Amino acid sequence: MDVCGWKEMEVALVNFDNSDEIQEEPGYATDFDSTSPKGRPGGSSFSNGKILISESTNHETAFSKLPGDYADPPGPEPVVLNEGNQRVIINIAGLRFETQLRTLSQFPETLLGDREKRMQFFDSMRNEYFFDRNRPSFDGILYYYQSGGKIRRPANVPIDIFADEISFYELGSEAMDQFREDEGFIKDPETLLPTNDIHRQFWLLFEYPESSSAARAVAVVSVLVVVISITIFCLETLPEFREDRELKVVRDPNLNMSKTVLSQTMFTDPFFMVESTCIVWFTFELVLRFVVCPSKTDFFRNIMNIIDIISIIPYFATLITELVQETEPSAQQNMSLAILRIIRLVRVFRIFKLSRHSKGLQILGQTLKASMRELGLLIFFLFIGVILFSSAVYFAEVDEPESHFSSIPDGFWWAVVTMTTVGYGDMCPTTPGGKIVGTLCAIAGVLTIALPVPVIVSNFNYFYHRETENEEKQNIPGEIERILNSVGSRMGSTDSLNKTNGGCSTEKSRK
């Protein structure tokens, strides 16, 4: 039976009396106009259907069959996925990646693992997340989520670019440390600070010159004291100022005997007075740092603190020796003065105290520390070369009457200065065989020294650039904060996340 050009087919019984149960969909008329004539072609299809169904009690009405072209074929029931099994499409500058939501949710603190963070990049029209970032790098970023926290840099991605991607996707400090370790970078030492507020202030004051203006002032004073101490150490050796404290035999008329006395006492020496002033500052600085340090064990492991201790020991040793000499016989005073001169020589190590306030010396020390293996190989190669060539030159010159090489140990000095390309000329071979040995020794020395030098230079460049980057990073936060505050004050807007349809909206607060 045809009604209005429609064929009969079975449809489920629908209650059209309640029009609220019919959902609005684009392209379908849902406005039931009661004023429309019954069966009028211009009326709504649903209103006409309502009339036809109400007039017949049989379910197989004229409107109960529709053409097969307009009916969707029956299919399987839809499977409702839980949140963890949902697929997520990530578009990286046009290259689409697909993963599951539970894979990203393993790391909720990251950009992709945090829903609110990643929703800022959601494209509701395409139902995907779009990032205008480096495409090859995302292979390593996605592998981090899939592997449960293993970071691997793709071979075709530079180190600095991949490091920027790790920072952008907020993978965290552990991922960055793992990446730097895999790439062969040396891990930065952790900075320990005292828990006590007063101790922390004094520790920063004396240990970190860049922490405040007062710390920089203390650093300037320390440098001046070190310079004065080194200057005094050098000036007192001049002939017009030198005081060797030579012993003089003086006859005592009262006792009718002779005794040995010093030409000048140490306590009347102006250099000793200046030295005492410097030692007071060094001791005060060392004791204060030891009291407020966060770890007493680490304090004695620090090479700089050991240098500070060694630099003040000669003064107290000299003071004790001077006091003891007043009661010791003259025979032991000569030995005491010899020991005293050796102890005073240790004062030269005070020059290393400047490295505490010099970034260049610190970089040099870190380079030597990181290159200990290469330096050990260099010394080992030199040792082999010295033994080999000193033996060869001895046997080449053994029959020469005027030879400088009377034994193999005498040839050690010649081999060292030749392999290091110094060549003093105080010892030289005279026979043709000895000259051939000398030529081979010089060539071997050049090759031995040149091999580890590139590694040492590479370590120096690494520490130098790392220190430069750290200084730049210290200046960046303040500049960024200033720019953000300036922009925020001009725009007067704050960004808020609108979770409707996965979008992100901006609410502007106008004053």
Curated annotation (Swiss-Prot):
Transmembrane portions of the chain: 218-238, 271-292, 303-323, 339-358, 375-395, 436-456
CDD domains: BTB_POZ_KCNA10
Activity: how regulated: The channel activity is up-regulated by cAMP.
Reactions accelerated catalytically: K(+)(in) = K(+)(out)
Gene Ontology MF annotations: delayed rectifier potassium channel activity; intracellularly cyclic nucleotide-activated monoatomic cation channel activity; voltage-gated potassium channel activity
GO CC field: membrane; plasma membrane; voltage-gated potassium channel complex
Source superkingdom: Eukaryota
Motif (Selectivity filter): 421-426
Subcellular location: Membrane
Biological role stated in the UniProt entry: Voltage-gated potassium ion channel that mediates K(+) permeability of excitable membranes. When opened in response to the voltage difference across the membrane, KCNA10 channel selectively allows the flow of potassium ions across the membrane down their electrochemical gradient.
Subunit structure: Homotetramer. Interacts with KCN4B/POMP. Interaction with KCN4B/POMP is necessary for the modulation of channel activity by cAMP.
Protein name: Potassium voltage-gated channel subfamily A member 10
The species this protein was found in: Homo sapiens (Human)
